[in-house]
Design a protein with these regions (language model features):
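Cofactor-centric catalytic regions
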Residues: 129-181
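Proteins synthesized as precursors that undergo proteolytic processing into mature forms
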Residues: 1-148
Length: 181
């Protein structure tokens, strides 16, 4: 059995409102709706009419709690992240790093990452130490390549290995791994 659980306040400290007597913050997920088509939200994502605010409607979100099964249907990996619009990039790259490049959990969550926001079409941002030759190759293909102005995700990962379970917390964030007996 496995659970991939991610939740969000959306931006730092959410709405800034603490529930009296309970001590937790309310989120500001309304920012994930498109208040006006073509106007970016706090993460720079351009909204459209399909994500307009409507009663009873759930907003689009980048939250991507993911459970990967092996060929026998057993849990092979559980992964999730915070990071707004960069969540999908971070989760995808960690999955690729483990599955295709055979990285350990810690190697995968610590690896450099890149992100494409969708607009502008030629802008790629990155976090971490990519080889200068890799960045130059992207520039030669017409991309503008810039360091991202905040960490790309905060991925938490659990991987089934032949020896048991491997877990890691992204050094970009404040999480930690706790193994329970």
């Amino acid at each position: 059995n496995a659970v991939a659980n991610t939740y969000t306040l959306n931006s730092d400290f959410g709405s800034g409102v603490v529930v009296a007597g309970a001590g937790f913050l309310l989120n500001n997920e309304m920012d994930d709706f498109s208040a006006k088509a073509g106007v970016p939200n706090a993460y720079g994502l351009l909204g459209g009419d399909a994500n307009a605010i409507q009663p009873g409607k759930r907003m689009l979100s980048s939250m991507s709690p993911t459970i990967l099964l092996d060929r026998d249907g057993r849990v092979a990996m559980v992964v999730g992240s915070m990071g707004g619009s960069t969540i999908i990039s971070g989760v995808f790259q960690v999955l690729v790093d483990v599955v295709d490049y055979r990285m350990s959990a810690q190697q995968a969550v610590s690896a450099p990452r890149f992100h494409h926001q969708g607009t502008p079409i030629n802008l790629l941002t990155y976090d971490g130490a990519f080889a200068p030759a890799s960045l130059a190759a992207l520039q030669q293909r017409g991309y503008t390549v810039e360091p991202h102005d905040w960490p790309l995700g905060d991925v938490q990962l659990i991987v089934r290995t032949q020896a048991g379970w491997d877990a890691a917390s992204d050094p970009r964030g404040r999480g930690e791994v706790r193994r329970l007996p």
